Amino acid sequence: GANASQPNLIMVAGRVAIGATGAVGASVGKLFTVTRTAAGLYTVTLDSNGAVPAIVYAAANLVFATGSDTQTVSILTLDATNKKITLQVNDAGTVDTAADPPSGSILQFLILVQNTVSVG
């Protein structure tokens, strides 16, 4: 039979607990690892054996340990070639200034990637 390539979307959803000084704690979800690369900067690496032609969509947010926390999180980079997404947590009082989320917070994200599968 003939082979055809068909784009498929794969959803990767996860969350990680944040400890003291922004340390990455326990995670929930599959197909990713999260590392803290600097204050307020986190890299999500997709655990994919195949190529990732495109990262179609990514979103992230914080669940705070207390109601008085006011930081925000943004997507800095989408790197399909290296299967990585960089997230930056910002201090709400200082725009574009990376800051660790408070201990006890949860960083959660949703990523849609395009993958190519041979059928036929």
Spans of features found by a protein language model:
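Extracellular receptor-binding modules and their adjoining Ser/Thr/Gly/Asp/Asn-rich linkers
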Residues: G1-V52, N61-Q71, L78-G120
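Cysteine-dependent deubiquitinase/ubiquitin-like isopeptidase catalytic cores across multiple families
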Residues: I55
